[in-house]
């Protein structure tokens, strides 16, 4: 099975070390462009662009990278409760059309009550997933070309429609990650690829089996992906030294503050990440070559595969054997590590190198009439 290898655009900051200004670098458009172009040339399938108040806006960043890349896809967040499904469907179709079919979407429900309150969202965990399920139903139906009437608990639309369809049919693939039961049910029923953070293989296997069974109950099959950091070097010793350097400037106060912030979230996935290290520096290798040091201060994905190219490739293939075909990777700093992964790891894997998409012909049409229909449909109306 050929593997889809993704990289990451660090719109929330970058540097040589975690938890310190030392060794950091400015993250401007030029730097993000360098990373995107490196990923494009090295054969990554796409880049994940993060979302949240600590990040630059993912949609604007993705749009700005379209003209400077050729085949790279952009995995961009959909935010139920923050954006209406109708507006999100228009944005998604536009990004897909402008990029010639290079748009992918990642459903993000949110987990930090403080950040959500700042965005005007005052729903608890179960309510957010109810709203996300309704959002996704409407979003998908619009991209499928339907005129949608929907009267849900959280979302109400009447006569919603999309005049400009996406390039990818039936719609651009939808990714999603969540560890709670309600999250797995949403994934099983509505998404195309279920993402998990980098837990030990036995825990990942358990989650995949749960989601696969729930999807089968809906008569569906879905794909699987995993989000990991990578520290790859020419030797295993050099890789472990690099891992230790990454957290060499962390002090206990910074770790404690970070763990307190993570504790206020209601994310089951974040709780599972925190349980891998319990905020302590010792015993961070939680599974062969799987290191939890990143999660001491970084929310979300908090584990890294550490080793030389053949060793890390062997661990990736262990995850692939569980049914995972997509690996969303990152490393610090992201420009240099994009090259290291491409040069030291890719030769030991069966990497699916994306082709440069050919321009897709669009149906000619005049200006929309009365903001309601396009002229070529007048005779049919």
UniProtKB/Swiss-Prot annotation:
Sorted UniProt keywords: Flavoprotein, FMN, Monooxygenase, Oxidoreductase
Miscellaneous remark of the record: FMNH(2) which is absolutely required for this enzymatic reaction, is provided by SsuE.
Function per UniProt: Catalyzes the desulfonation of aliphatic sulfonates.
PANTHER family membership: ALKANESULFONATE MONOOXYGENASE (PTHR42847), ALKANESULFONATE MONOOXYGENASE-RELATED (PTHR42847:SF4)
Keyword Flavoprotein: yes
A biological-process GO annotation: alkanesulfonate catabolic process
Organism whose genome encodes this protein: Escherichia coli (strain SMS-3-5 / SECEC)
Oligomeric form and interacting partners: Homotetramer.
Any Pfam family hit: Bac_luciferase
HAMAP family: Alkanesulf_monooxygen (MF_01229)
Enzyme Commission number(s) from the entry: 1.14.14.5
GO molecular function: alkanesulfonate monooxygenase activity
InterPro entries named among the record's database cross-references: Alkanesulphonate_mOase_FMN-dep (IPR019911), Luciferase-like_dom (IPR011251), Luciferase-like_sf (IPR036661), SsuD_RutA_monooxygenase (IPR050172)
Reaction equations catalysed: an alkanesulfonate + FMNH2 + O2 = an aldehyde + FMN + sulfite + H2O + 2 H(+)
Family affiliation: Belongs to the SsuD family.
Name recorded for this polypeptide: Alkanesulfonate monooxygenase
Class of enzymatic activity (EC top level): oxidoreductase
